[in-house]
Amino acid sequence: MKILLPAFFIDTIPNMEIQVASLRDLGALRRLENEIFKKDAWSILDLMAVLTWSEVVRLKAVVDNEMVGFVAGDPRPAQNAGWIATIGVDPRYQGQGIGRALLRACEERLNFPTVKLTVRISNDRAISLYEKEGYRTVDIWHRYYNDGEDGLVMEKVLQK
């Protein structure tokens, strides 16, 4: 299923499509996760879960029939918020607006007034993107990552 993009993304990345991801994308997603996140890459079981759990918003960015980005959004009705569970773009395609397009598409489909995410405190590039997209740091989770690095909890209040 193709997802319509705002004109900005069509003009800057004319051959990119955002599509709903499925279990058929497991191999491509695993390669992408390992390339992007290396030591933080999700296990095959985690990837299978995110691709099959019916409530998760899962979208992929495709350029020339190749998955070059992915985002998963986790609805949390009890918190009246959605969480960006993971988002990543192939290093060859970073800086071209694909991450922004995936983030916005996921926010829209989560359909909550607030969207949250966690990011490594050292990931300046991602933090910059999130801040430009309206996210603000609301908490620090100390030693959140396996190697002991802190995670920033960022939140965006959407205009609904």
What do the predicted segments below correspond to?
Residues 3-9, 20-94, 100-109, 157-159:
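Acetyl-CoA-dependent GNAT
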Residues 81-85, 124-130, 135, 142:
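Conserved N-terminal glycine/acidic-rich loop preference
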Residues 116-119, 131, 136-153:
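Conserved catalytic-core motifs of GNAT/GCN5-like acyltransferases
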